[in-house]
């Protein structure tokens, strides 16, 4: 998201007085006269009433409101940062009061201008960005201010927020993303859990549970094994949520169905959809079967995945769409031929398998190199004889 540079062709004092008059005309309790205490007091009073332009009945367009807020921002950025912190925080809080999405978009632009005009080394950028995310949610523009964790970190590279501040921001991002982008919300929660250390991981119980639930609910997250290594998740061992995660990490469909039968109320209380869970477990079970079965019959899939005869082909097509498995379907022979599959877990056996594969490639390449060398030498020798 890009905001225009802040520049108003008027003296700061004159701007402040015009803003006072404008807000007073809208019914705000503010004097039209400039403060004898200086521009900072003027700005304090202006920010205190600037949300009056959000009220119903104002005869001003969104463009006019945007211009007024831009004028406020232009004064804010002219104040030295060491004296402007409270003013910036107060303005940010006012921008979160936009009553509808259209006004929220105007406020989002104003906050983005403010954020863009702060020095990259300013710690206030964090506070402005936090409010940016809040307003972006109301404006349905979250993707404009957050595209991923790497982008987020780069924005604060010259003045990294504290660990506690990042935890607060990650929680907010998860909250605004969970209903519209579950995959990104899951990544944010995993990043959040990564901020905890062995010393404070026990305090991350709620975050860890949210992370697990978000990952399980995300239809595009299938590699769940890394969650088990996160310290806050380890502290949940022995609890139902950890048991459920373990089922999704390494068990097959029957194990999930048994878990649901025994703990139906718990699963539902976490906001998880049973039918979606079954769909995901079928995909995960297929992946696990594909690891050790280069060829599977349709009947085998019916039995293992508990699906009807007419559901097998549509299911295989859905699996192939995920690109988790590369396979070829032989409809005539009613078989599936597996080329490759993503492993559900990647532990020591998988590393050993990868090591063996790389060694085999190395040996084959060495053999090819030696054969090519022999052919080359033979050709040279033949050329000399001729």
Swiss-Prot record:
Pfam family membership, one: eIF3m_C_helix
GO CC term (a single one): eukaryotic 48S preinitiation complex
Single GO molecular function: translation initiation factor activity
InterPro entries listed in its UniProt record: ARM-type_fold, COPS7/eIF3m, eIF3m, eIF3m_C_helix, PCI_dom
Keywords recorded for this protein, A-Z: Cytoplasm, Initiation factor, Protein biosynthesis
Coiled-coil regions listed: none
Domain PCI stretches: 181-343
Subcellular compartments: Cytoplasm
GO biological process, one term: formation of cytoplasmic translation initiation complex
Chief location of this protein within or outside the cell: cytoplasm
PROSITE patterns cross-referenced by the UniProt entry: PCI (PS50250)
Record family assignment: Belongs to the eIF-3 subunit M family.
Function: Component of the eukaryotic translation initiation factor 3 (eIF-3) complex, which is involved in protein synthesis of a specialized repertoire of mRNAs and, together with other initiation factors, stimulates binding of mRNA and methionyl-tRNAi to the 40S ribosome. The eIF-3 complex specifically targets and initiates translation of a subset of mRNAs involved in cell proliferation.
Subunit note: Component of the eukaryotic translation initiation factor 3 (eIF-3) complex.
UniProt xrefs under PANTHER family: COP9 SIGNALOSOME COMPLEX SUBUNIT 7/DENDRITIC CELL PROTEIN GA17 (PTHR15350), EUKARYOTIC TRANSLATION INITIATION FACTOR 3 SUBUNIT M (PTHR15350:SF2)
Protein name: Eukaryotic translation initiation factor 3 subunit M
């Amino acid at each position: 998201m890009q905001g225009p540079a802040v520049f108003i062709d008027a003296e700061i004092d004159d701007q402040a007085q015009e803003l006072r008059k404008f807000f007073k005309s809208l019914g705000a309790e503010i004097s039209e006269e400039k403060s004898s205490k200086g521009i900072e007091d003027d700005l304090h009073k202006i920010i205190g009433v600037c949300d009056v332009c959000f009220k119903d009945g104002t005869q001003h367009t969104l463009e006019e409101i945007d211009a007024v807020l831009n004028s406020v921002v232009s004064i804010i950025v002219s104040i030295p940062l060491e004296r402007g912190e409270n003013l910036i925080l107060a303005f940010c809080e006012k921008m979160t009061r936009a009553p509808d999405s259209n006004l929220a978009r105007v406020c989002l632009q104003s906050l983005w201008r403010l954020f863009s005009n702060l020095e990259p080394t300013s710690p206030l950028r964090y506070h402005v960005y936090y409010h940016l995310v809040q307003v972006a949610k109301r404006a349905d523009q979250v993707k404009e201010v957050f595209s991923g964790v790497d982008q987020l970190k780069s924005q604060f590279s010259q003045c990294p927020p504290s660990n506690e501040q990042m935890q607060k921001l990650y929680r907010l991002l998860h909250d605004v993303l969970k209903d519209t982008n579950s995959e990104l919300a899951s990544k944010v929660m995993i990043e959040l859990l990564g901020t905890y250390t062995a010393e404070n991981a026990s305090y991350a119980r709620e975050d860890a549970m949210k992370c697990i639930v978000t990952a399980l609910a995300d239809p595009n997250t299938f590699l769940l094994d890394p969650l088990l290594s996160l310290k806050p998740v380890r502290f949940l061992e022995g609890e139902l949520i950890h048991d459920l995660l373990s089922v999704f990490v390494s068990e097959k469909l029957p194990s999930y169905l048994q878990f649901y039968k025994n703990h139906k109320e718990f699963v539902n209380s976490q906001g998880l959809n049973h039918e979606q869970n079954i769909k995901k477990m079928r995909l995960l079970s297929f992946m696990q079967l594909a690891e050790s079965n280069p060829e599977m019959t349709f009947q085998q899939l019916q039995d293992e995945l508990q699906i009807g005869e007419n559901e097998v082909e549509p299911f295989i097509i859905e699996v192939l769409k995920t690109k988790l498995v590369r396979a070829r379907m032989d409809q005539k022979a009613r078989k599936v031929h597996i080329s490759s599959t993503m492993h559900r877990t990647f532990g020591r056996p998988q590393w050993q398998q990868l090591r063996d594969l790389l060694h085999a490639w190395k040996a084959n390449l060495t053999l090819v190199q030696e054969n090519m060398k022999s052919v080359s030498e033979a050709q040279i020798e033949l050329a000399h004889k001729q």
